[in-house]
């Protein structure tokens, strides 16, 4: 599906506030709320819009430990590892990477004990290097994708 400039404007507004009313979007781009809703539905159906989300403060939720785990496979058990990753809520992000490591995992937990348990479970798939975050200095939700600048 190709998106046009109107779809792009709708995406920009939704990116700033996913809870914005269709009517309000319509007022900003000179369309009816129903027409906006139809365009949004079409973008959802075509996979342009995959989900709507919230952003929580992990520290206020009690998740005070953030770790980055470079993971090195010791066998060709990638499918098993991916299934394991999918079941673990402590792993908030997982990326297949180039270089020496096979995967980069972002782990967010509320205690060292939980982190240690996860790391022990990972050992059946390979080895890791662990980097603990001391302080988050920037967190950016990629709104630049929706920028027209």
Curated annotation (Swiss-Prot):
Cystine bridges: none
Gene3D superfamilies recorded: 3.30.70.920, Winged helix-like DNA-binding domain superfamily/Winged helix DNA-binding domain
Annotation: DNA-binding region: 22-41
GO molecular function: sequence-specific DNA binding
SUPFAM superfamilies from the UniProt entry: Dimeric alpha+beta barrel, Winged helix' DNA-binding domain
UniProt cross-references to PROSITE patterns, sorted A to Z: HTH_ASNC_2
Gene Ontology BP annotations: response to amino acid
Keyword Repressor: yes
GO cellular component annotations of the record: cytosol
Keywords of this entry: DNA-binding, Repressor, Transcription, Transcription regulation
Start and end residues of each HTH asnC-type domain: 3-64
Main function: Negative regulation of glyA transcription and kinB-dependent sporulation.
Protein name, UniProt field: HTH-type transcriptional regulator LrpB
Lineage: Bacteria, Bacillati, Bacillota, Bacilli, Bacillales
